Amino acid sequence: MIDVRFRAIDEETPGPLLQRQLEHTWPAYRAWYLREGEAARPSYVQCRRMLREHLPELLPTWERLVELAGGGDLEARFLSLYNPPAFIAGCTQALWLHRGPALVRNYDYAPRQFDGLILRSAFNGTATVVMSDCIWGVLDGINETGLAVSLAYGGRQPVGSGFAITVVLRYILEFCGEVAEAVAVLRRVPIHVGYNVALLDRRGRHATVFVAPDRPARVEPWLVSANRQAADARPDDPSVQDSALREAVVQARLSDPGSGLGELVETFLTEPVWRDPNRHGWGTLYTACYLPAERALRLRWRDGEWVQGIGGFQTGERIVSFRADQPHAPRAQFQ
């Protein structure tokens, strides 16, 4: 059995709560950031220059986070999220456009490397609720305009010069209000590893954007994506080579005229889309259902749910236990 702690914190701008998060996670993040040696990471000057060139509106937030981290050179470079070590998050995601809309996704990762932090903030005046990574990066999230985003590893090996996708998603939620604006950001900002980004706004406008360091971003109207960047592609990493199967199962549910949003969410909680974290030391750590019209997030596990939102955000903590024989809880009701 594996236990994973989820915490929800609310901090309008970076302050003591994020400072404590920095202090708690820095030893592990420092080891991760230096795993290829310090020379493999960009200098402070380069990190600052790239932020100023590509994500200038984030500079004040970055500077405040660096201050909270003690002002160290290494901490500043890490927090820029420019050219960090490559990381892989399995993931499956779908866009629901009927009587919704909704963005549903599974986040698949190693429990020991997962922050488990749900963060409500308004760093630059726009309220956001996100699943956080690397202190201020975004795995998935929603902002007060109803724009929802999520990521999945693209399944390709090339690594280049660019930002972690998580800080680019932070930028999108801070400064974009609709899908077209988010797409423009993904087209212009360099990304260091290939990722598939699902976008949805409250009017149902949507896109799946395939970003990579070695080719231009490609925008598609796809409703389902996992860990490949073309319909006939085979992921490079063996841990995500079931991408086609997961996509097919989710697509079949989306295409079923008798299925609603509740049935779609249940598909994400069922194998093969759901993957047991006990089996290989990594797996599905949560299912997220973002509801742009409500500006809300419904986190689901096989034995429970935690509802969050831009309004009525609940701070607190929950321990989620993953057991190999874990039964489903009764299905949550979605309108």
Task: Set out the residue ranges of the language-model regions.
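C-terminal, well-structured catalytic/ligand-binding subdomain of enzymes
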Residues: 1-71, 81, 98-335
